[in-house]
Amino acid sequence: MFQKILIANRGEIALRVQRACRELGVKAVMVYSEADREAKYIKLADEAVCIGPAASPLSYLNMPAIIAAAEVTDAEAIHPGYGFLSENADFAERVEKSGFQFIGPTADSIRIMGDKVSAKQAMIKAGVPCVPGSEGELPDDPVQIKRIAKSVGYPVIIKAAGGGGGRGMRVVHTEAALINAVAMTKAEAGTAFGNPAVYMEKYLQNPRHIEIQILADKHKNAVYLGERDCSMQRRHQKVIEEAPAPGIPRKLIEKIGERCAAACKKINYRGAGTCEFLYENGEFYCIEMNTRVQVEHPVTEYITGIDIVKTQIMVAAGLKLPFTQRDIQVRGHSIECRVNAEDPFKFIPSPGRITMWHAPGGPGVRVDSHAYTNYYVPPNYDSMIGKIIVHGDTRDQALARMRTALDETLVEGINTNIPLHRELMVDAKFIAGGTNIHYLEEWLAAHKR
């Protein structure tokens, strides 16, 4: 096991990894920007190193500064968290070339899965079903593009090969709009991701977003930890996640889970990963694989009893997975609400000082947050300041616990989206379960403030 790990991230995930290190008896080095200097988790760190000013490119995306911090503190490994450099293959490569262990997959795995075209090809090869579409990057010839769209069938969606986080995609309903949409997506992709390549997929009208959590070690062992339903989204950004997915037969989940685990063995994957699917009419279609820990990992931890972050660290240290597929049992139901510092209905970010922070408690309630009374939420980063996660024996009990937890939560000084969550937890369609990925946006349009 490592003696010391550097955590190359901020906020709630930095604190989450710090806690995992403490449990494993590993020293944690935190890096921070000038905007995060006063954060409590920085003050609680074994060691902390300032890596630059508030702007992300000069701090949390600054590879030389992060690697230098690992060198001066004698860390042995670097955990990237999620976001920032977590899915940057060049960073993973530089970390390992500098003599540190990257707590995540190899740079090659990240490269394959980070490019949506090569990821899709790898998944198809491993027998994982994918959304019908162009089997690779779209050509430049407009005639060929139109031919591909015709064979796939409208509506289609144009996606950036290097995209992610819900950016770099465009839905096209008619041939007349096709070529312009491809050109615009290419231009955007080149600017945003440094890669203008785009591909085409059939646009599913009313799918659900279901993902399979994978853990794999360096000894060709890979398991799946059930599924999560992340269909409650706004602008392709997840708002509420739950596990297991309501109303999907276990046999279907087992079949797709086994295929995902087999695919990971085939490509010598290591660490935590998530295969994301669109699910419609009883069919799963793989859309991408995330090569990092997910924001919503706690719902899976709750239903399986497996600590995903600790396991990430253990397999990076060369240990075998301490469990087999047979050991993994799904128990009860878990729901997570992301708490964002923003207007709950207009979604305008609300940075500033939290004058009062009171987190909920009680049986089956977990709060993952770096916030506290008098904490200043900087305007420089993502608006998420925490997550409320609940677990119950049944989905109904989990919903009841979440309603109570949201009512108990008190945040003053800034706006948060907690009022939105309170309303969604009593919404009849959400309570019934199985809403599709468009439901939240339709709900918001019908409940305009």
Predicted region positions:
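ATP-dependent carboxylate activation and anion-phosphoryl transfer catalytic cores
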Residues: 7-23, 48, 71-73, 96, ...
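Acidic/histidine-enriched active-site and ligand-binding environments that engage anionic O-linkages
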Residues: 147-157
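A short acidic, helix-capping loop that chelates divalent metal ions and anchors anionic groups
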Residues: 166-168
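ATP-binding N-terminal substructure of ATP-dependent carboxylate-amine bond-forming enzymes
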Residues: 1-126, 138-147, 397
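Conserved, charged catalytic cores of large soluble enzymes
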Residues: 172
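Conserved beta3 strand of the protein kinase N-lobe
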Residues: 133-134
